[in-house]
């Protein structure tokens, strides 16, 4: 039987680092990190995530400002708020809750976020630096994947890694981070032929396709490390892209959902805000 990778335990270690950083600054009467989060409309998922981000930030001593705009506003209203935050030296990180309502130009609005405060790595400049191997901030979900793999003290160099999914939020950036670690990376998607065989040859399998319980035991080998990034509602429960009960008996390591990648993502977002504060001081 495989071992479970506990994302909550890894997150606790990072949280301790953040707490120490914030407490040290408070003792020296220095500024503490402050994050601004913008919500447009009333999407239930975005409201939940913003609340979760605020809760974690407050528990670590990081200030968190919530800005809520009605769906009846327009692109320029959102951009005006972003520009204010860009100019505010007391704000170190800006989060734009996505997706925006359909009547907004998401790309146009994202472009307005200062790269120095883009702790979610959304802007073209941030993503360009990532693909050039010189990221200012690491995108949080892909960084969670890498952090969990490294927590196993396993050398990624030369490993055969299969990334299932090619989204701009997870698939592509996690593949780039793995390339930066000198892994041999294959990206698979809905048009990939012989998908089961490709996945089965992976030393590390990262699954991010948004299809609950898609990966079963026939997709993995007994030495595989399987990282499940998916989160879907399935039969009234939050479920990953991997059929946990079937795969845990076949692979070497597996992240659960919930309790895996998602447990670490918000913590790493807040860590990015700490790094932004430090950079702005120099």
Swiss-Prot record:
<feature type="binding site">
    <location>
        <position position="190"/>
    </location>
    <ligand>
        <name>NADP(+)</name>
    </ligand>
</feature>
<feature type="binding site">
    <location>
        <begin position="165"/>
        <end position="167"/>
    </location>
    <ligand>
        <name>NADP(+)</name>
    </ligand>
</feature>
<dbReference type="InterPro" id="IPR046346">
    <property type="entry name" value="Aminoacid_DH-like_N_sf"/>
</dbReference>
<dbReference type="GO" id="GO:0009086">
    <property type="term" value="P:methionine biosynthetic process"/>
</dbReference>
<dbReference type="GO" id="GO:0035999">
    <property type="term" value="P:tetrahydrofolate interconversion"/>
</dbReference>
<keyword id="KW-0378">Hydrolase</keyword>
<dbReference type="InterPro" id="IPR000672">
    <property type="entry name" value="THF_DH/CycHdrlase"/>
</dbReference>
<keyword id="KW-0521">NADP</keyword>
<dbReference type="GO" id="GO:0004477">
    <property type="term" value="F:methenyltetrahydrofolate cyclohydrolase activity"/>
</dbReference>
<dbReference type="GO" id="GO:0000105">
    <property type="term" value="P:L-histidine biosynthetic process"/>
</dbReference>
<keyword id="KW-0368">Histidine biosynthesis</keyword>
<comment type="function">
    <text>Catalyzes the oxidation of 5,10-methylenetetrahydrofolate to 5,10-methenyltetrahydrofolate and then the hydrolysis of 5,10-methenyltetrahydrofolate to 10-formyltetrahydrofolate.</text>
</comment>
<dbReference type="GO" id="GO:0006164">
    <property type="term" value="P:purine nucleotide biosynthetic process"/>
</dbReference>
<dbReference type="GO" id="GO:0004488">
    <property type="term" value="F:methylenetetrahydrofolate dehydrogenase (NADP+) activity"/>
</dbReference>
<keyword id="KW-0511">Multifunctional enzyme</keyword>
<keyword id="KW-0560">Oxidoreductase</keyword>
<comment type="similarity">
    <text>Belongs to the tetrahydrofolate dehydrogenase/cyclohydrolase family.</text>
</comment>
<keyword id="KW-0486">Methionine biosynthesis</keyword>
<keyword id="KW-0028">Amino-acid biosynthesis</keyword>
<keyword id="KW-0554">One-carbon metabolism</keyword>
<comment type="pathway">
    <text>One-carbon metabolism; tetrahydrofolate interconversion.</text>
</comment>
<dbReference type="InterPro" id="IPR020630">
    <property type="entry name" value="THF_DH/CycHdrlase_cat_dom"/>
</dbReference>
<comment type="subunit">
    <text>Homodimer.</text>
</comment>
<dbReference type="InterPro" id="IPR020631">
    <property type="entry name" value="THF_DH/CycHdrlase_NAD-bd_dom"/>
</dbReference>
<protein>
    <recommendedName>
        <fullName>Bifunctional protein FolD</fullName>
        <ecNumber>1.5.1.5</ecNumber>
        <ecNumber>3.5.4.9</ecNumber>
    </recommendedName>
</protein>
<dbReference type="InterPro" id="IPR036291">
    <property type="entry name" value="NAD(P)-bd_dom_sf"/>
</dbReference>
<dbReference type="Pfam" id="PF00763">
    <property type="entry name" value="THF_DHG_CYH"/>
</dbReference>
<keyword id="KW-0658">Purine biosynthesis</keyword>
<dbReference type="Pfam" id="PF02882">
    <property type="entry name" value="THF_DHG_CYH_C"/>
</dbReference>
<dbReference type="GO" id="GO:0005829">
    <property type="term" value="C:cytosol"/>
</dbReference>
<feature type="binding site">
    <location>
        <position position="231"/>
    </location>
    <ligand>
        <name>NADP(+)</name>
    </ligand>
</feature>
């Amino acid at each position: 039987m495989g071992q479970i990778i506990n994302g909550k335990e890894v997150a606790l270690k990072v949280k301790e680092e953040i707490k120490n950083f914030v407490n040290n600054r408070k003792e020296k009467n220095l500024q503490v990190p402050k994050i601004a989060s913008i919500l447009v409309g009333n999407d239930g998922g975005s409201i939940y995530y913003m609340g979760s981000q605020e809760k974690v930030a407050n528990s670590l001593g990081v200030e968190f400002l919530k800005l809520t705009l009605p769906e009846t506003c327009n692109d320029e209203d959102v951009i005006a708020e972003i520009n204010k935050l860009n100019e505010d030296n007391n704000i170190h990180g800006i989060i734009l809750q996505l997706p925006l309502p359909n009547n907004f130009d998401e790309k146009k609005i994202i472009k307005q976020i200062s790269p120095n405060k883009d702790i979610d790595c959304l802007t073209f400049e941030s993503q360009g630096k990532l693909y050039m191997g010189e990221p200012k901030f690491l995108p949080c979900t892909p960084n969670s994947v890498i952090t969990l793999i490294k927590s196993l003290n396993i050398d990624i160099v030369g490993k055969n890694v299969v990334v299932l999914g090619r989204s701009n939020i997870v698939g592509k950036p996690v593949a780039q981070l793995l390339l930066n670690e000198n892994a041999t990376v294959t990206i698979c998607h809905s048009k990939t032929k012989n998908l089961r065989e490709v996945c089965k040859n992976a030393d590390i399998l990262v699954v991010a396709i948004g299809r609950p319980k898609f990966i079963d035991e026939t997709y993995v080998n007994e030495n595989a490390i399987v990282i499940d990034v998916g989160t879907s509602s399935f039969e009234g429960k939050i479920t990953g892209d991997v059929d946990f009960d079937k795969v845990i008996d076949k692979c070497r390591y597996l992240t659960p959902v919930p309790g895996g990648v998602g447990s670490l993502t918000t913590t790493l977002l807040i860590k990015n805000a700490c790094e932004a504060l430090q950079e702005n001081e120099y």
